[in-house]
Amino acid sequence: MNINPFANVSLQDYLEIVQIVDSTFPIGSFNHSFGMENYLREDTVTDDKGYEEWQEAYLASQFKYGEGLVIKLVYDAMVTDNIDQVWYYDKVLTVSTQARETRQGTKMIAKQMLRLIQRLHAIPVLDDYQSKIRKGVAFGNPAIVFALYVFNKGLGCNEAIALYGYSVISTMVQNAVRAIPLGQFAGQEIVLRSFSQLEKMTQEIQELDASYLGANTPGLELAQMKHETQVFRLFMS
């Protein structure tokens, strides 16, 4: 898949997007393992190989049919000037998340992401999103925040999915480096190997419609639920 991220985006805007997807952007993602820590607790994940298998499963299900797909759907809605559809996707994706900690963690990340982006850039549509969350008529999802932000910047949909996916992978690997633990070199090898899966998923997502939104693998959801009662843990979810 060939992309040209600078086709409709200035270098300044592109760098501002890169700032948002940097794993050091302080939105709280480092506090969440999204169930991976439960696999550690049960000795299902014990090393770099086990972690990479977990990550591949997470990306192929929860990310692909969740945050990855919702970016594509937000783009479709914004192209047709149907902002109400975006708020509908916010609701669908939130209520389809079974694990309470994951649901709450996602909302916390979205709220912090909104606060930071709005402090830096003040995007009108994100003002609307923030207002709806405060009023309790929207929940908040970081992928939707990101999609609205980069659509406003003129970034293409495929590029948006790929960059957001990279951000997710980078953060999860850094969490695994701390928790398993993994060596930094092993972690970066996993990041590099994940790019082919991310490219393939980015293409596959373009073929999906809203009926797939929120689909997930039961094993991942169960691990996220069990994490809620896990006694010793590093992460909030």
From Swiss-Prot:
| A Gene Ontology term for the protein's cellular component | cytoplasm
User: Matching Pfam families, A to Z?
Assistant: UreF
Question: Which organism is the protein's source?
Answer: Streptococcus thermophilus (strain ATCC BAA-250 / LMG 18311)
Query: Subunit arrangement?
Result: UreD, UreF and UreG form a complex that acts as a GTP-hydrolysis-dependent molecular chaperone, activating the urease apoprotein by helping to assemble the nickel containing metallocenter of UreC. The UreE protein probably delivers the nickel.
Q: Which UniProt keywords apply?
A: Chaperone, Cytoplasm, Nickel insertion
What the protein does comes down to: Required for maturation of urease via the functional incorporation of the urease nickel metallocenter.
Q: Where's it found, cell-wise?
A: Cytoplasm
Q: What is the protein named?
A: Urease accessory protein UreF
- Source taxon at top rank: Bacteria
Gene responsible for this protein:
ureF
Give the family from UniProt.
Answer: Belongs to the UreF family.
Q: Which GO terms describe its molecular function?
A: nickel cation binding
